[in-house]
């Protein structure tokens, strides 16, 4: 382990002893010892166990890490430890159980070599600057007391002052009972600190290790932008024993584990310990990259960033003239749009983006498999990508709910849009859905509300928003991802208020009249461009996107780069105002200007982003 350099914050007193010697001595002893795996109960030789970062090579069980070991694992060599604050009154309640509270703290310090249950540091992950606060369960169960809350808050305030991402590694049984309600106040204090980082647009990441419960789980552990969990890590407000003893409820297998929480929409990703550095590095590269218009970009988007090349010049990237599109029967487009070979959202992501970080869950109840969302880089530009996901086989379609999102899917999309607004990243959406998922459960969980909230949210995003209908654009379920500055459509895609079959059944009383309904609804790209519903059409390879998915993806990528370059020239207020004008004109009264700015121009309202956006808007 590389010993950290020491550093103190002005006005604080660095505690003794320094933690590094105790950790090194422990590691030397561990190397010669045998360890019993907490998962499969296999005996592991110390040298092999430590080489695997305390992960069982047989079953993958992740043993606890000390805070200094965690920092050494995550950070580049040369990181510096921040001073641990000392509360004015370390024993405010004069608390005694079987031993006085000060004696317990003293014993914990002697046993661990730490000043408190958290170690904070300044360092880098693959060169990207970060502030890290790592908790240590060995110190009074990692409990949240005044010193821990103050240390984490100060780490956050340093991240705020330096506009540096904050990473918090959690390991805690909850609030420190010996400090009473003063411990509980640390939940509020740290939560307010994270709120300030949200306002400032500073990325926050929580790394959940086992266990994380109580006041820590109900504050900073679950308020960060991205929640990463180690395999098997447990997270919850009330522990299993409390639940079983209080309400006598039988708990399901795997309850409160990372895997359980991923399925229930609480954590973004599960990352094995050996992959954590790479995962955090990838996330930092995207989230902290500066969004700039490509050098030489013009209002027409004649040049754009790198990425896949389509071999076409700028004029062919997006077709904006109706005369340049062939006349066709809309039913032909419907059949092409539904072809299973067309590139899906995940196909487009894999072909177009670098450093993609898929984010899961609505942070409330579920993770919808029909909606994919995350952060990545297109030609070096960081952005948020959100899209409905179908599949190429019946099995894949079934697994992805046939691309029909649940309320949790739309709420996941909204969460990632808000994150993009906070970080100042453009939003790109890919739409290929027959519509929002219907059914009892969807209605019980507020499908209408989830869609409506997305419409309102997208209208106020202070960043460029581009929507691409890549296949089917079905009704409000598609519109919930299409309130954008530019709405593009692939040449063989369709976009409609209802499926042709549904329209035919209702109005013609005959499902076989679907081709006639498609024609009446004008669902194809040419007619929707003529109506002004879409702003441009993305060409497809000969034979359609299914015939050459790689080329089709390249064409989409070229269209996106050109469009984002154009939108990047406008500020947040102008983007919001033009987006409002774009949708305000639909259904305007004849003879009245559809674009007249009413009192309280939309661009002047508060955006769901950070303070820098609001400053630019003033």
UniProtKB/Swiss-Prot annotation:
Keyword GTP-binding listed: no
Compartments where located: Cytoplasm
Positions of the UniProt region annotated as Carboxyltransferase: 33-566
Record note on cofactor: Binds 1 zinc ion per subunit.
One GO term (biological process): malonyl-CoA biosynthetic process
ZnF (C4-type) ranges: 37-59
Protein name per Swiss-Prot or TrEMBL: Acetyl-coenzyme A carboxylase carboxyl transferase subunits beta/alpha
């Amino acid at each position: 382990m590389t010993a950290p350099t020491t550093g103190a914050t002005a006005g604080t007193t660095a505690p003794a002893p320094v933690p590094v010697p105790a950790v090194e001595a422990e590691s030397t002893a561990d190397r010669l010892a045998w360890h019993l795996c907490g998962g499969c109960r296999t005996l592991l030789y110390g040298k092999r166990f430590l080489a695997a970062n305390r992960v069982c090579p047989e079953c993958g069980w992740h043993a606890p890490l000390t805070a200094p070991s965690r920092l050494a694992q995550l950070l580049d060599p040369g990181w510096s430890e921040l001073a641990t604050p000392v509360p004015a009154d370390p024993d405010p309640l004069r608390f005694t159980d079987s031993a006085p509270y000060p004696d317990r703290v003293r014993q914990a310090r002697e046993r661990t070599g730490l000043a408190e249950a958290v170690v904070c540091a300044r360092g880098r992950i693959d060169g990207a600057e970060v502030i890290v606060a790592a908790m240590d369960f060995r110190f009074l169960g990692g409990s949240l007391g005044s010193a821990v809350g103050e240390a984490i808050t100060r780490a956050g305030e340093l991240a705020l002052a330096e506009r540096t991402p904050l990473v918090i590694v959690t390991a805690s049984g909850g609030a420190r009972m010996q400090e009473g309600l003063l411990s509980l106040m640390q939940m509020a204090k740290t939560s307010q600190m994270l709120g300030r980082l949200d306002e400032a647009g500073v990325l926050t990441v929580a790394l959940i290790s086992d266990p994380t419960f109580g006041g820590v789980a109900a504050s900073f552990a679950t308020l960060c932008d991205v929640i990463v969990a180690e395999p098997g890590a447990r997270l919850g407000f009330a522990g299993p024993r409390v639940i079983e003893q209080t309400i006598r409820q039988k708990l399901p297998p795997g309850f409160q584990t990372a895997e359980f929480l991923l399925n229930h929409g609480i954590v973004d990703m599960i990352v094995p310990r050996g992959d954590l550095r790479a995962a955090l590095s990838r996330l930092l590269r995207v989230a902290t990259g500066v969004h700039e218009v490509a050098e030489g970009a013009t209002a027409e988007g004649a040049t754009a960033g790198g990425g896949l090349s389509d071999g076409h010049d700028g004029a062919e990237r997006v077709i904006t003239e109706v005369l340049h599109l062939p006349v066709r029967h809309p039913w032909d487009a419907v059949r092409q749009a539904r072809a299973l070979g067309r590139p899906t959202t995940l196909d487009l992501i894999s072909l177009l983006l670098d450093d993609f970080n898929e984010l899961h869950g609505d942070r409330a109840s579920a993770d919808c498999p029909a909606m994919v969302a995350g952060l990545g880089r297109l030609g070096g530009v960081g952005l948020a990508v959100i899209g409905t996901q179908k599949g190429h086989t019946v099995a894949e379609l079934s697994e992805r709910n046939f691309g029909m999102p649940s309320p949790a899917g739309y709420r996941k999309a909204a969460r990632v849009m808000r994150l993009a607004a906070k970080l100042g990243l453009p939003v790109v959406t890919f739409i290929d859905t027959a519509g929002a998922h219907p059914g009892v459960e969807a209605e019980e969980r507020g499908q209408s509300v989830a869609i409506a909230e997305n419409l309102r949210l997208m209208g106020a995003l202070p960043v460029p928003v581009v929507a691409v209908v890549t296949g089917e654009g079905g009704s409000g379920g598609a519109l919930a991802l299409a309130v954008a500055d530019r709405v593009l459509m692939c040449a063989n895609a369709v976009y409609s208020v209802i499926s042709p079959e549904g329209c035919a059944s209702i109005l013609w009383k005959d499902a076989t009249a679907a081709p006639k309904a498609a024609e009446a609804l004008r669902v194809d790209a040419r007619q929707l461009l003529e109506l002004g519903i879409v702003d441009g059409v993305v060409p497809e390879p000969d034979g359609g996107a299914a015939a050459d998915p790689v080329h089709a993806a390249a064409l989409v990528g070229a269209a996106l780069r050109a469009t984002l370059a154009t939108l990047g020239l406008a500020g947040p207020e102008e983007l919001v105002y033009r987006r409002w004008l774009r949708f305000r004109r639909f259904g305007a009264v004849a003879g009245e200007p559809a674009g007249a700015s009413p009192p309280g121009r939309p661009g002047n309202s508060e955006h769901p982003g950070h303070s820098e956006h609001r400053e630019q808007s003033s």
